[in-house]
Each structure stands twice: as structure tokens, then as C-alpha cells.
């Protein structure tokens, strides 16, 4: 197994926190399972007067073997602890290891949450989830960090893509500051890139504004690649709420593309539903509902019958439902 990354050091009175170290990759194997990837180290906190938090380290990649090794989780982003400072970004999760035999493939690592902002400062972005290989579970995206008093919430990390399994969900956006700031946008859902099973991952929800500010937009749903039978795209995330005093609701994320069907007469995949728009609380406009995902095309087969070419056409899938307005 790969070693874990070390944590970054915290700053003193002022200055940025140190970044966390990356986890090591696992070693490949032939007749036993591949090694696990190491965890990413956490980022250090910023200075007590001012300074940004350090970024979290990335998780190591799981290795290939008779069974696949697990990918390491990303390290948490450090907080901006002082009067002002931005939270550090969360580390990305490591890819899971594929498998060359009956044991299961390795699970991918999760993206880590972004650090909180200081009294004035934005929250850090969440890390992206790791890719699921050969049917392994993909890693979910990390949540964006919250702002403290004045600042915007961090964006959620993207969900990991997958082959032969479901795409992972995107992370939620962080909340805006208690006095002013917008919510962060939700992360994109993971796509399904290959295989006859699995649907696109859900987009992350947008972060809420707390007093004055707009809600964050929901993340887009993951797209679905073609398969023998059409599979569905992922749903978009809902938009965040506007501030209690003023602010618009966030827009819902669009749904993912439905997958094309390849088999004769098979129906294409349904597009993912659009996310709902976020509400406005007191003064402001509600968010728009997200667009539904496009449908996948139906499968076809052309064959010569008595010298004539005939075609069997599968019906296209259904478009995704449009999200409700806030």
C-alpha cells in the first residue's frame, strides 16, 4: 500500500498554512490484490491574524491486481482562521484499481471538503472524487467550504467518473457568509464512460446564502455513454436558497445526457431530470429549474433479408424532466 501523505503545518499569527502531502500509489500485483493508495494529508490552518488555509493532499491511486486496491481519500483543506483568509481546497480522491480476476475492483477515494473561510474570505473548493475503474465504486465529490462572515461558499467537487458502474455524486456547494456572500455551486455528477450497467451521477446541490447573497447553482448530472441497452443520465442538483434578507435562489443544474442504445430495437436511455431552482426567502427571484437531459438514440440493426435491407429501429429514450422553478 502507498503511504499516507503528511499534514501541512498551521501558520502562527499570519501566513498561509502548509499543504498536505499526497498519498502514495499502491503497487500492482499479479496473484494477489493490488495495494491501496495512501490518504492525502490535511492542509494546515492559516494564521490567527490573517492567512489562507493550505490545500489538502490528493489520495493515492489503488493498484491493479487479482483484486483491485482502493484509492485513497483526499485530505481536508485547511481553514482560513483569522480576520481574513480563504479556506484551502480539499484534495482529490485517488482512482480505484482495476481487477484481473474474481475479486472486486477497488473503490475509488472520496474528494475531501474544502476548508472554511476566515472572518472575511471564501470557503475552499471541495476535491473531486476518484475514478471508478472496471466496475469499482467511484468516489463522491467533496463539499465546498463554508464562508464565515463575509465571503462566498466554495464550490463542490465533481463526482468521479465510472466504467461499468454508476457515476458518483458531485459535492454540495458551501454556504455563503452570515453577513454577505453567495452559496457555492454544486459539483458535476460523474459520467459513465463504458459498460452496459450504471447511470450518471447526480449533480451536487448549490449552497445556501445566509443573509444577503444568491444561492449557488446546482451541479449538472453526469452523462451516460452508449451501451447495449440505453441507460439514464444523472439528475441535476437543486439550486441553493437566496439570503434571508435579499438574494435570488440558485438555478437548478441540467440533467445528464441519456445513453445511446446499440442493440437492435433497444430503447435509448432517458435524460436526467433537471434540478429544481432554489427559493428566494424575502426579496429576490426564485431560481430557474434546470433543463432536462437529452435522450439517447435507439439501437438499430440492418440485415439483408431476401436481398432487401431492412432496419430495426429502437425508439429513442425520453428527455429528462425540466426542474421546477424556485
Annotate the PLM regions.
Residues 1-326:
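Glycine-centric low-complexity repeats
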